[in-house]
């Protein structure tokens, strides 16, 4: 026999504790998804801005370090010594390794000092305070029209740097038996910009000339300027002794 069902009873509203629990769960999920979307959209913008700011600060560190060293450094002529023969003709050029290593050490110390100021934010012009960037929330949309809308989110950058230096010498020949000596300091700075849950390293290099000198050697009596692979003709010139003997003969004959 079919069972008789009584009248359908409508259920009442959910208890308050269930409503509160569902609201909290929904709020946590929606907040997590929103933060994940915002972070994914803003992170590339933050890293690009941080890299540009890092390169700017690293360039200032190099310039200030070289300027501080050049203002207090010893005479750059001591970096190389030119040796001549008894006739005053240039024979060899010797580089003073002690002075070269001293230059490298002093510049490295200057760079490390400025990088330390940059990391601790105590005194370097351009890094006197933490780098703070305010990104509009409209950057999340990726739309140029809406990019400047919404509240601005402050993001703080931290910087960590390391420096490498080397003294390079180049000798470039020019003219006839002439040379141009170029002594420069190669500087490489690696600065890592750190934001919450992300980091990126920027490398800045610079080659700073510290001493340039033109050296003129003895002009040869014969010069093959063609540079070809042909046979070089042999030209024999009378020596000074032979010229003196010939002149004496001419005087005696007269």
Curated annotation (Swiss-Prot):
Subcellular location, principal: membrane
Compositional bias ranges of the Polar residues kind: 231-242
Compositional bias per record (Basic and acidic residues), positions renumbered to this chain: 243-254
A Gene Ontology term for the protein's cellular component: plasma membrane
Protein name (database record): Sporulation protein YunB
Signal peptide: none
Membrane-spanning parts: 18-38
UniProt gene name: yunB
Species of origin: Bacillus subtilis (strain 168)
Induction, as annotated: Expression controlled by a sigma-E-regulated promoter which needs the sigma-E factor for the binding of the RNA polymerase and subsequent transcription.
Biological function: Required for sporulation.
Topology in the lipid bilayer: Single-pass membrane protein
UniProt-annotated stretches for the region Disordered: 226-254
Keywords: Cell membrane, Membrane, Sporulation, Transmembrane, Transmembrane helix
Gene Ontology biological process terms, A to Z: sporulation resulting in formation of a cellular spore
Taxonomic superkingdom: Bacteria
Keyword Transferase: no
Localization annotation: Cell membrane
């Amino acid at each position: 026999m079919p069972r008789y069902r009584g009248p359908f009873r409508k259920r009442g509203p959910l208890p308050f504790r269930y409503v509160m629990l569902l609201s909290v769960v929904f709020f946590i999920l929606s907040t997590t998804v929103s933060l994940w979307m915002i972070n994914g959209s803003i992170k590339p913008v933050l890293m690009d801005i941080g890299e540009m700011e890092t390169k700017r600060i690293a360039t200032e560190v190099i310039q200030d370090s070289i300027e501080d060293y050049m203002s207090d450094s010893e005479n750059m002529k001591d970096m190389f010594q030119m040796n001549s023969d008894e006739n005053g003709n240039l024979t060899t050029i010797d580089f003073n390794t002690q002075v070269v290593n001293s230059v490298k050490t002093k510049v490295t110390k200057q760079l490390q000092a400025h990088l330390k100021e940059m990391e601790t934010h105590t005194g370097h012009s351009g890094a006197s305070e933490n780098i703070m960037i305010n990104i509009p929330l409209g950057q999340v949309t990726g739309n140029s029209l809406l990019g400047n809308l919404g509240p601005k989110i402050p993001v703080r950058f931290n910087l960590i740097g390391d420096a490498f230096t080397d003294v390079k010498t180049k000798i470039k020949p020019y003219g006839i038996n002439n040379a141009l000596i170029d002594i420069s300091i190669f500087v490489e700075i690696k600065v890592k910009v750190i934001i919450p849950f992300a980091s990126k390293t920027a490398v800045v290099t610079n080659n700073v000339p510290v001493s340039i000198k033109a050296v003129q050697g003895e002009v040869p009596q014969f010069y093959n300027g063609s540079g070809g692979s042909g046979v070089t003709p042999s030209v024999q010139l009378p020596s000074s002794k032979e010229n003196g003997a010939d002149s004496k003969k001419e005087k005696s004959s007269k």
